[in-house]
Amino acid sequence: MNRLQRQLTLLALMLLGLFAAGSARALCITGVCACTTVTTNVAFGSYSPLAFGNTDSTGSVKVSCGGVAGLLIPFSIGFSTGSSGSYATRQMKNGSYTLNYNLYTDASYTTIWGDGTGVSQMVGGGVTLDVLGLAPAQTFWVYGRLPGRQLTAVPGVYADTINLTLTYY
């Protein structure tokens, strides 16, 4: 099992299945395939603590894999809790001040993206090993929500760092 860790920074201003899956798994374990991610930040922009509505934003995670044959590689994507240590409520920080937010797997903001523990779920999929550079990367959208009426916020830049773990077999 291989793991690739990338960082996704949050700023307040974050089929060619020619062989069986078992063959693909064996190739990845022996180092014949490699998967990568490209991320875009979830940037919330300006925030007014007096506003009643939520501030929403999106980012993305693109997954692509390369190797010796057009095998389908299953994978999962997990996110860390960030500085809050909790999936229930993540927090961006500006010194000792915080803003609550969270990251979701869906546009209805119902499923928290995490590592599969507690209230969180991972996202999974499969991508074809790209031998010739022709297979498109698989894109997953990250939905960020910053709740309104966080009256303790002070002006400044709030940020959090989320570790992304891509596990492929």
Where are the language model's segments positioned?
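Extended, solvent-exposed segments with strong compositional bias
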Residues: T110-G133
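Predominantly extracellular/luminal cell-surface or secreted proteins
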Residues: G78-G82, N102-D106, G114-G116
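N-terminal signal peptide c-region/cleavage motif recognized by signal peptidases
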Residues: A21-S23
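Bacterial N-terminal signal peptides
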Residues: L10-F19
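N-terminal small/polar-rich segments of proteins
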Residues: R25-S96, L129-Y169
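Bacterial N-terminal signal peptides that target proteins for export
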Residues: M1-L11
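Acidic Ser/Thr/Pro-rich low-complexity disordered segments
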Residues: L27-G31, Y109-G114
